[in-house]
Amino acid sequence: MLQRLTAALLMLATMTVALPVTGHCDTLGQIKKSAEIRLGYRTDAPPMAFNDESGQPSGYSVELCRRIADAVKEQLKLSSLKVTFVPVTTEERIDAIVNNKADIECGATTMTLSRREKVDFTAMTFLTGGSILSLADSGIDAIANVAGKSVAVVTGTTSQSGLEAYLEKNLIQAKVVEVANRDEAMKRLQAKQVDAFASDQIVLIGLLMQAPDPGAFKLGRDLFSYESYGLVVRRNDADFRLVADRALAQIYRTGQIEQVYAQSFGKAGLRPSELLAAMYAFGALPE
């Protein structure tokens, strides 16, 4: 009897160890219970996410998140839903989702496999690439021109890894200067402490849109990487991600994305690139 009990306990222990940890999340249930959705957003990534002149969250990704919040409200059949904006930095944005400080992150976050070890992403929301910004009189208008010069890049971003890989592959000798954020990079560039600033092209365009004197800068004419953006959500939460993806598909399918794009980038006279237009078309999934 004792032997059979011991064998059964050992088998149970073995089975318990072998069971995978699913870590299922129930963001929709949490939102329904609290009647609140928390939108993490960047304050320093125009035109994707930033605080406007009145201090209100604004930008392309923020607008998409607002519409996803509307879809969540409808899905849960709530009479009202409080939308709370949670500011996050480049360093905090992933952990804010993992640690349940925000339900979705609305910024300029590139989808990568290493990030998917910790979080998940919605369907793609934007396509851009790494480029450089320099002073107008610097003579730098392409990545190759940074040879022998210094380039600022925000620490820990895909722009940093993409730039370093491009420089190594193309045997371009340049000094990569790590900075904490875009504000520091712009200050160093204006003070001529660095020769260029590398970041996602759409973010550099956003900085130019906000600059008092855009003519003082020059945007690089080529890209050193391609970046696909998505909105960050928690892993193992297919139900919430489905609501977000369904909302995005409807926005793409009905042409609402044209309004969102014009609202965010119209002042700069930008039109969606062929790649971005294709992304919208492929993302317009049917019900």
Please place each PLM-identified region on the residue numbering:
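Beta->alpha turn/N-cap motifs
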Residues: 41-45, 86-91, 100-112, 136, ...
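Periplasmic-binding protein-like
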Residues: 43-44, 126-137, 201, 208-248, ...
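Bilobed "Venus flytrap"/periplasmic-binding protein-like clamshell domains
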Residues: 38-47, 57-74, 110, 128-182, ...
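Ligand-binding clefts/hinges and TM-proximal coupling segments of bilobed small-molecule sensing domains
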Residues: 32, 158-177, 215-217, 249-287
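Acidic, polar ligand-binding/catalytic clefts
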Residues: 66, 77-145, 282-286
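Extracytoplasmic small-molecule ligand-binding "clamshell" domains
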Residues: 25-105
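Extended ligand-binding regions for polar small-molecule ligands
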Residues: 59-71, 144, 149-150, 155-157, ...
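A ligand-binding cleft/hinge motif common to bilobed small-molecule-binding domains
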Residues: 91-92, 106-117, 161-169, 190-191, ...
